[in-house]
Amino acid sequence: MKPKLSARSFVMLNEFLAELVGTCVLLMFGCGCVAQAVLSGGANGGMLSINIGWGLGVLVGVLIAGPVSGKQWSSKLNQYSPFVGAHLNPAVSLSLACVRKFPLTSLAHYLAGQYLGAFLGSSI
């Protein structure tokens, strides 16, 4: 008999994968532009390209992770849903959990996705 995922398990898996991919993309953009500037000796990039690269990394990471684990626009209610997501940083998730703005039940899979995504993004 094939085990079935519950609705909560499916949501947790989606949030985990969203944080993993979003953090991975953030680190790929950021570390990639720093490596380009450093390895070229400043000929192919400087402080401006590094800052733009990190900014684009945050933008793309939030665009990837936000719709899955973040605030979504609800056309029926004409308001944002109350879910918080697209942290892309373990310090953000942990500090929000400490001030009780983020559920402790979601903290483990958010942190796991962020750490694994950061490892993969910096490795690539």
Each PLM stretch: what is its role?
Residues M1-I124:
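Membrane-interface helix-loop junctions and terminal tails of multi-pass membrane proteins
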